[in-house]
Amino acid sequence: MCVRALCLSTVHVSDQSSKLTKLQTNVSASASLHISDQSSKLTKLQTNVSELRVAFSAGLTDSGSVGPFDKETTLIFSKIITNVGEAYNPTAGVFTAPVSGLYVFSFTAADYLKGYMGLYLYKNDKPIVFSLDLNDHGGYASTSNAVCLQLEEGDRVHLGLPASYRLYDDSRNFSVFSGFLLFHL
């Protein structure tokens, strides 16, 4: 009887050992899958964070006066101060949203001759903000404005100079256009 109990006990231990091995294999596989999933999520988050770095500032020109023109003209702020994410195109004067989000844009413009100076800020060719000044004293004057815009990926923002208006800029950056992503939506 003892021998039979010993045999049954050995079978039971062997069965338990087999079950334990299977359980360890399942736990190990599950842990590996979980770690792989977490690693994938971390990589995606790191990618998203790097995509969210968007900011630019650009001066208008070193050449002095810009305008007046016979018709409204898109201004090309070609003097890049900062262009993190390369979303501002200094050749076309247009910012293109690389991701959907809430963006902040600001601009300052100056002139020193008597007359009107001012700028429109456009989103997808629709005027959003206008800022102007009548420089009636003939010294340096400036105007500025800022706006928060909800943009979808691919939306475009630029500044336009109205017909018969003029601006001034030189190496001191009197006239500057800036924007940055506040947060991703």
Give the positions of each predicted feature.
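Extracellular, disulfide-bonded carbohydrate-recognition/adhesion ectodomains
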Residues: G64-G67, N83, L113-G118, P162-Y165
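Exposed beta-strand and adjacent loop surfaces of beta-rich binding modules
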Residues: A55, Y116-G118, V176
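Noncatalytic modules at the cell exterior or secretory-pathway interfaces
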Residues: Q150-A163
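Extracellular beta-rich ligand/substrate-recognition surface
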Residues: K79-N89, D133-Y140
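C-terminal helix/juxtamembrane-tail motif
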Residues: A163-L185
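Terminal beta-strand-rich extracellular "head" domains
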Residues: A109-E153, D169, L185
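Beta-rich globular "head" domains
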Residues: N83-Y120
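Assembly "stalks" and propeptides
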Residues: M1-T82, E86
